[in-house]
């Protein structure tokens, strides 16, 4: 083995991603990454004893994130860099907020406080950190609103993607405005999940 290949092997061995359950922060990050890429199964694997309500909430968030990501993919394929709808940028900001969020650890329990978001509660289960009930972070009204929003988001994303493919939407600005209008948004930076 040459010195270069040995150094490369050492680098690769030491630069592997952290075990998702190794710390509260790495667990919360792995959970959010899974949700944002639309992978409800991987996200649910990081939830402590998921209830039916947890499964619904995680699947809803993952489906919404996936629909919006696919819409942005269609917009960027049609309009190039101008087709950026702010969705990927919002996802990056959400992940970055976890990296800097204050963390409280008390024994086998932890709470991460991301700026501008609800606290993420975690607990250690058999030596691994897991996200506590995502559904409990929502009130009953918020759960009902999530269900409505999911349906609206998926329908709006599919409809707008179809319009972009059919060239009925003429510009990236028109696509962003149509998405904001469909989702009832007036903000300039991205769209919420």
PLM segments and residue spans:
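Hydrophobic helical h-region of N-terminal Sec-dependent signal peptides
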Residues: 4-12
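Short solvent-exposed beta->alpha transition segments
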Residues: 19-20, 25-30, 37-105
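Regular secondary-structure segments
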Residues: 28-36, 180-183, 187
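Terminal "cap-and-tail" regions of soluble proteins that handle hydrophobic small molecules
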Residues: 151-193
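C-terminal region of N-terminal signal peptides and the immediate post-cleavage residues
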Residues: 13-18
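C-terminal or late-domain output modules
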Residues: 49, 123, 136-141, 160-171
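Short beta-strand edge/turn micro-motifs at domain boundaries
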Residues: 109-113, 117-153, 157, 190
């Amino acid at each position: 083995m040459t010195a270069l290949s040995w150094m490369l092997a050492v680098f690769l061995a030491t630069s592997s991603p952290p075990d998702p359950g190794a710390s509260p922060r790495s667990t919360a990050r792995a959970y959010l990454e899974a949700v944002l890429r639309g992978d409800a199964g991987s996200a649910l694997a990081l939830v402590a004893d998921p209830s039916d309500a947890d499964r619904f909430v995680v699947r809803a968030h993952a489906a919404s994130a996936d629909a919006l990501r696919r819409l942005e993919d269609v917009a960027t394929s049609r309009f190039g860099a101008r087709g950026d709808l702010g969705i990927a940028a919002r996802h990056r900001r959400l992940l970055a907020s976890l990296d800097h969020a204050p963390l409280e650890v008390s024994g086998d329990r932890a709470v991460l406080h991301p700026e501008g978001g609800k606290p993420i509660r975690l607990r250690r289960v058999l030596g691994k950190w897991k996200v506590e009930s995502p559904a409990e972070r929502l009130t009953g009204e918020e759960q009902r609103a999530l269900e409505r929003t999911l349906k609206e988001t998926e329908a709006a994303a599919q409809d707008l993607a179809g319009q972009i493919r059919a060239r009925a939407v003429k510009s990236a600005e028109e696509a962003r405005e149509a998405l904001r209008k469909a989702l009832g948004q007036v903000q300039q930076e991205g769209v919420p999940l």
